[in-house]
């Protein structure tokens, strides 16, 4: 079915920054995708093309990327007349048109918008939901697996104001019977946590961060974990809900000293208190011994390979590479060879096409890694990643707290998918790391 029209426009993400929205029109109607954007971006990611005009949006405009879709990509794609159902061919064409390894010419934000909108057009042409089409593209087996929602309920690091260095603390409802039950448990714990935060740290502690989590003025990881543990207990789920952390440690790595500064938000932090990677690894292990931690993301800086490999050898929980791997096939290959981590954080906008995202997941599965599909801190009402998580059988999705519409949009979409699939789906639960094999 030919493409009648490709049109991009500038819209906004949840942080008030511009992003690219793409419409693809075929005989089945209009198919739309919006590209997310991150705050802490890894240096090995595909290029998010920004205008750089400081007079508008502080330089963060995407009018160049929009123009690239409307004047270059769209006309070329229509002329090429590729079948929208052949996603690999479409994405290969987009990459060739760009001509760079990191999509720096046309912009990964321009290319991804088109790639995802095309996938939606293809699903419509086949008369199936998007997750079914993605499952077909990836060749995943049935039944469908619904992911465990990793819910970021407490924010620190670059996402929040207090001294807390670690960026995200997530609750993981991995003993629930179903996705909807897991989400309910998460929502109940979140409400308790909000009330606790206000009571202990004052009314403003109930204010939410970019991803919907609370951001009280917390100093240490222990303090954060104690608060979450108390909320889990108050909700009646002690022993039933696990915890995960995204440390985002590249944000507080001192490259020259090769040390980690847990007081990085303080301009006068004391260099004698900075930690070596061994000391930081010991801190993680002591936390995991005391709290039900099942997953740690970005425990070390993105190029501190030695630290990752050291930690991997001595840990049994899930170690997720985000800044380390940036959904990039070459980085994933290196991480597999160096035995650096055992799970991939999959962010479609880090690599820039659906085909490459699917391949990144398959490469990870092939080495028995887990795959966690992830939102970005700058999100929109687009729910594509919910379908990707189900279509890829990833078994785990990270899309913020059960708060703020741009986060809940994805979780609500999985509720709909769960209802639609009924008995034909299983909840990943405790098997979230190996759900592709369920």
Curated annotation (Swiss-Prot):
Cofactor binding note from Swiss-Prot or TrEMBL: Mg(2+) is required for catalysis and for stabilizing the dimer.
Where does the protein principally reside?
cytoplasm
Q: Where is the active site?
A: 211 (proton donor), 347 (proton acceptor)
Pfam families hit by this protein: Enolase_C, Enolase_N
From the UniProt record, give the pathway where this protein acts.
Answer: Carbohydrate degradation; glycolysis; pyruvate from D-glyceraldehyde 3-phosphate: step 4/5
- GO CC entries: phosphopyruvate hydratase complex
Substrates-to-products reaction catalysed? (2R)-2-phosphoglycerate = phosphoenolpyruvate + H2O
Query: By what name is this protein known?
Result: Enolase
Q: Which gene encodes it?
A: enoA
């Amino acid at each position: 079915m030919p493409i009648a029209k490709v049109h991009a426009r500038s819209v906004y993400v949840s942080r008030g920054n511009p992003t690219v929205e793409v419409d693809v029109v075929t005989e089945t109607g209009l198919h739309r995708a919006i590209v997310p954007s991150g705050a802490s971006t890894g240096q090995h990611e595909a290029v998010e093309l920004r205008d750089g005009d400081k007079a508008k949006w502080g330089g963060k405009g995407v009018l160049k990327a929009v123009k690239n879709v409307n004047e270059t990509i769209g006309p070329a794609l229509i002329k090429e007349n590729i079948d929208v159902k052949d996603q690999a061919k479409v994405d290969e064409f987009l990459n060739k048109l760009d001509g760079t390894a990191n999509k720096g010419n046309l912009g990964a934000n321009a290319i991804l918008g088109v790639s995802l909108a095309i996938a939606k057009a293809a699903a419509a042409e086949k008369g199936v939901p998007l997750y079914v089409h993605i499952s077909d593209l990836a060749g995943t087996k049935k039944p469908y697996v619904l992911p465990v929602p990793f819910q970021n309920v407490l924010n620190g690091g670059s996402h929040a104001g207090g001294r807390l260095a670690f960026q995200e603390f997530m609750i993981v409802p991995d003993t629930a019977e179903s996705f909807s039950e897991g989400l309910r448990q998460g929502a109940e714990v979140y409400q308790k946590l909000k009330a606790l935060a206000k009571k202990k740290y004052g009314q403003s502690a109930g204010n939410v961060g970019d991803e919907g989590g609370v951001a009280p003025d917390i100093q240490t990881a222990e303090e954060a974990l104690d608060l979450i543990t108390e909320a889990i207990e108050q909700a009646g789920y002690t022993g039933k809900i696990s915890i995960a952390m995204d440390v985002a440690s590249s944000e507080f790595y001192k490259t020259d000293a090769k040390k980690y500064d847990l007081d990085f938000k303080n301009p006068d932090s004391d260099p004698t208190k900075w930690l070596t990677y061994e000391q930081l690894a010991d801190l993680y292990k002591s936390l995991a011994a005391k709290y039900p931690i099942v997953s740690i993301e970005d425990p070390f800086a993105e190029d501190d390979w030695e630290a990752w490999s050291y930690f991997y050898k001595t840990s049994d929980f899930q170690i997720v590479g985000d800044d380390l791997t940036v959904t990039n096939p070459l980085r994933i290959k290196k991480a597999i060879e160096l035995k650096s981590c055992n799970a991939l954080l999959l962010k479609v906008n880090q690599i820039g096409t659906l085909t490459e995202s699917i391949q990144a997941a398959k490469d990870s599965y092939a080495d028995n890694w887990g795959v966690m599909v992830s939102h970005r801190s700058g999100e929109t009402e687009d729910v594509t990643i919910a379908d990707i998580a189900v279509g890829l059988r990833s078994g785990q999705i990270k899309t913020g707290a059960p708060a703020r519409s741009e986060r809940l949009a994805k979780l609500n979409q999985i509720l709909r998918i769960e209802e639609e699939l009924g008995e034909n789906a299983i909840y990943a639960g405790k098997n979230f790391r190996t759900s592709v094999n369920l």
